[in-house]
Amino acid sequence: MKTTGSSVGGTKRKMWSRGVGGVVREQKAKLYIIRRCVVMLLCWHD
């Protein structure tokens, strides 16, 4: 019984870290897209 409790805690921790990693990756992707759009608009304006 004790081993199952620790394994559940481990899976929760893995899911939490994966969730945070996904959020960070999503933020980086959004920043990358916005940066690309700004560069394209600036180059197009010239």
Curated annotation (Swiss-Prot):
Keywords: Cell membrane, Developmental protein, Membrane, Transmembrane, Transmembrane helix. The chain crosses the membrane at residues 8-24. InterPro entries: DVL, DVL/RTFL_small_peptides. GO terms for cellular component: plasma membrane. Residues 15-46 are annotated as: Required for DVL/RTFL small polypeptide activity. It is found in: Cell membrane. GO terms for biological process: negative regulation of cell population proliferation; shoot system development. It is a single-pass membrane protein. Belongs to the DVL/RTFL small polypeptides family. This is Small polypeptide DEVIL 5. It comes from Arabidopsis thaliana. The gene is DVL5.
